[in-house]
């Protein structure tokens, strides 16, 4: 019931089709864009003042580009152009645009996290020897990754810090 929503202070929205090739392009785009819009709309209508969203490194257009695409500059930062070629990256750009619009309309804190390739602790021993031997294997991820524990800390910091807007 809606009466219980008054006790919710923050929404952390990470639900989505998490990458390409898990669903059709149209389903990936529609699922991710509509779910983000619906979360933003419902949360702001209920007066929730903080929303944390999962965006992605794929917004830069390097990760799932057809052929080799290089970033326009390195290190890549939040001001780097977002020009993805794939439905997943496009859906994340659309989510960021919606988040900025909702933030401007409501004044809520809405934080979109452009998360890099998430690595679990056991994957260091399994994957990283190959990455060290051939760094080009990480090119599509702009040589970046985030440890699951660091991602958890990032979300925790977002929960603790108020007033950043978008």
Predicted regions and their residues:
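NAD(P)H-binding glycine-rich loop region in Rossmannoid oxidoreductase-like domains
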Residues: 1-31
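Conserved cofactor-binding/catalytic machinery of classical short-chain dehydrogenase/reductase
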Residues: 10, 35-38, 50, 80, ...
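SDR active-site strand-loop-helix element
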Residues: 11-15, 51-57, 61, 113-115
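Short alpha-helix in the Rossmann-fold core of NAD(P)-dependent oxidoreductases
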Residues: 29-36, 40, 52-55, 91, ...
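Conserved Rossmann-fold NAD(P)-dependent oxidoreductase catalytic core, especially the SDR/UDP-sugar
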Residues: 38-85
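Active-site helix of classical SDR
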Residues: 87, 91-94
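Alpha-helical substrate-binding/gating segment
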Residues: 118-121, 126-135, 141-166
